[in-house]
Amino acid sequence: MAIRSVIAFEARHIEPALALYRGCPGVGLSAGDSAPEIAAFLARNPGFSAVVETPAGDLVAAVLCGHDGRRGFLYHLAVHPDERGRGLGRALVAHSLSALRFAGIPRVSIHLFTNNAEGAKFWAKLGWRLRADLSVQQFELRD
């Protein structure tokens, strides 16, 4: 299948990206991953997130990326299972890291489910390292 190049993640991509995320094992969505909240995230972090489409406009890969001014974060990197192994995930990560570097962000983190062995292999191949000295703590502000 012919693939277009990496393009900016726009509001029109939200619903297709959510469908992609739901169909990819290892990607977890929460209440904070609604279309309005992703739209707000994209507006707050323009140019950091990206997608890949086919020439027909079918979304086959996506990543959400943003920063807080000090640290960057990649969320929900997903490539359609039929399109894996073609460098799409690597290209999306490269796009986001380039945008973060340009913004002067020196460090980037991801959250990866501990049972996502395929994801762990992917990130290790790209040179990412597990921080065994940290754990993620979360507090829910929603009722």
Question: Which stretches of residues belong to each language-model region?
Answer:
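Conserved GNAT acetyl-CoA-binding A-motif
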Residues: 100-112
